[in-house]
Amino acid sequence: MNRTIIEMFYDDLKNICQKFNITKEPIIEINKNNTPGLLSSSICLISSKQVNKKPLDLANDFKEQLLLTNNYSSIQIANPGFLNVLVKPEILSNVISNVLTLKSKYGNLEKQNKIINIEYVSANPTGYLHVGHARNAVIGSVLVNLFKKAGYKVQTEYYVNDAGNQINVLAVTVFVHYLQALNIDAKKPENCYAGEMYDDLAKIIINKYNDQFKDIKYTDNKILDDNVHSLFKQISIDYFLKIIKQQLADFNVKIRHWSSEQEVYDTHQIEKVLKLYKSKDASYYKDGAEFLKTTQFGDDKDRVLVKSDKTYTYILPDLATHHLRIKRTKADKLINVWGGDHHGYIKRMQAGLALLGNDPDILEIQMVQMVRLIKDGSEYKMSKRKGTAVWLVDILELVGVDALRYMLASKSSNSHMDLDLDLITLKNSSNPIYYAQYATARCHSILNQAKIKKITPLVKETNLLNNPKEIELLLILDNFKEVIKNSANNRSTQQICDYIQNICKIFHSYYAEIKIIDENNLELTKLRLGFIKAILQVLKNAFFIIGIQPVVEM
């Protein structure tokens, strides 16, 4: 059976709708009112007026038709017109075969023939990644996995901010640390970056160049020798990009395309975009500045592109970059994962791209709010490395990759998050990641015990898997495709974590209640082993989306 159980019920309802000339779409709920295995639909309520019938009368008509399908062990009508059905256990048991046949592909949606380009992290190459970048990295990488599972072709993008004043400040920061490492009394400007990481880079530069730059002067944002300034900029960018790439790899984040802001300048993309705006009559001059007509696409005011002193505003290179990305990637949708402080920037970016002739909806922003670390009941600030940020590498030393990824994915990205470091290191059921990985460990333990006893799992259509928790779990496993679809549509990493927790909650209860390996009832034991394999496979598939590993033993 290739259809899911929910698709079967939907198809049955849809066929009846067509027979009765009903155009409404059936809506289905699972395990309603905490009734294991119950499928419920409000189709009779929402369509009764269309056929001029009372909801209860229409529900009785639907019941008669559903009985003819021979798919349901129970069909009940509840006021004021709900249809509640229980699928026959033998039909429900086919879920196991579906899962174990498709394995890692279980839950995959049909190919969408659409390209989604996701830009995430995009931290300035001015230092290490911090905990805010970590949340962005998790949300972005989980969305990548989720959209792939949902049938999209997904491209990953990191925008390197390697132009602009922050890179000039970086060069001066590293230069000052270089001078200080040579025991020269060099005063660090107030706007420079803080942290011992710059000492490490300064030592590398000294090893290669010795003290040949010791007599060169500097300002707040400029080394007063163009060649040396350019050298320190490039060395610093290369050094921190290499570190960022390694830190992301260690955090199970893989980004394929790294685009450069400096390249946008060097290839004159900004000038090309300015000409394009003029050719489309999308810009105008006022008080010596060049404005963009963003109010035509819903912005609250027109935005300055070029100031009266002929310098560019921040939005112009961003618009050029995104326009270039649309042409380069041929993506149907650009999704940028941005920090919450960028909210006011969204409408002007969308308007600016639309004025270039792009689809006004092609750019979508996924907001990621701040994350605060809590330890011993209060905000946690690290002092291992001097500086103001809490570094990703330090957090990973405390809690590990899987725990941090899971917890950062488990809350809506659009809400502020307190991350309890004490909670995620506990080894009990109050810790969501431990609770989830303990479920996979238990599955492995059961299957290993059976292997030792030489009992092999059995997968076949059966009515023996009729325990309420078995029925409830089978329906939840069956619903995986719907969870993938809804999570992708809602851009929700949290829904996948909620799904995992739901499976684990029922499974742990089932494990405590049922003797799974019963050598006095080998047929049921073998069927339950197949059931356990299916649970493990779906958990593995869900874990893969989050980017964490199933645990074999604990």
Swiss-Prot record:
It is found in: Cytoplasm. It catalyses: tRNA(Arg) + L-arginine + ATP = L-arginyl-tRNA(Arg) + AMP + diphosphate. InterPro entries: aa-tRNA-synth_I_CS (IPR001412), Arg-tRNA-ligase (IPR001278), Arg-tRNA-synth_N (IPR005148), Arg-tRNA-synth_N_sf (IPR036695), ArgRS_core (IPR035684), DALR_anticod-bd (IPR008909), Rossmann-like_a/b/a_fold (IPR014729), tRNAsynth_Ia_anticodon-bd (IPR009080). GO terms for biological process: arginyl-tRNA aminoacylation. Keywords: Aminoacyl-tRNA synthetase, ATP-binding, Cytoplasm, Ligase, Nucleotide-binding, Protein biosynthesis. GO terms for molecular function: arginine-tRNA ligase activity; ATP binding. GO terms for cellular component: cytoplasm. Its main location: cytoplasm. Its EC number is 6.1.1.19. A motif ('HIGH' region) lies at residues 123-133. The keyword Protein biosynthesis applies. It is an enzyme of class 6 (ligase). Signal peptide: none annotated. Belongs to the class-I aminoacyl-tRNA synthetase family. Monomer. This is Arginine--tRNA ligase. It comes from Mycoplasma capricolum subsp. capricolum (strain California kid / ATCC 27343 / NCTC 10154). The lineage of its organism: Bacteria, Bacillati, Mycoplasmatota, Mollicutes, Mycoplasmataceae. The gene is argS.
